[in-house]
């Protein structure tokens, strides 16, 4: 439905359901940063720009879920040999495995607080370092997660480092 309402890129939509055969950095460590929306993308771009500028041995893969975030990245003209933007593949187990097998990230940074169960479980299983940057949770959401304590514990223990948006 999003594709037909022009909220998706007609050509790049397939990135959400498969791994495209774009440039792959064979000789560099892949650091994967996921910022779901345009606001999260905008907030993490200064960090990405610094990483690209100061670390030639790493490759930054930035994923997002929205067309507007992709358009923002195009405007910033970040695409070079050390950076690539892709759309975040759907949180479906076989797609998650295919994506992680292709990119083989050495570090993963998720921005804000969306929870992707299949990604978190597979990342944890592969022991890939995972950081939550600018994490936050509302009281209402916290109460909901308390209903499923075992699942919550398993998912949130996937993170190696959580840097909250505030101390509250």
What residue ranges belong to the model's regions?
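Active-site and donor-binding regions of nucleotide-sugar-utilizing enzymes
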Residues: 2-168
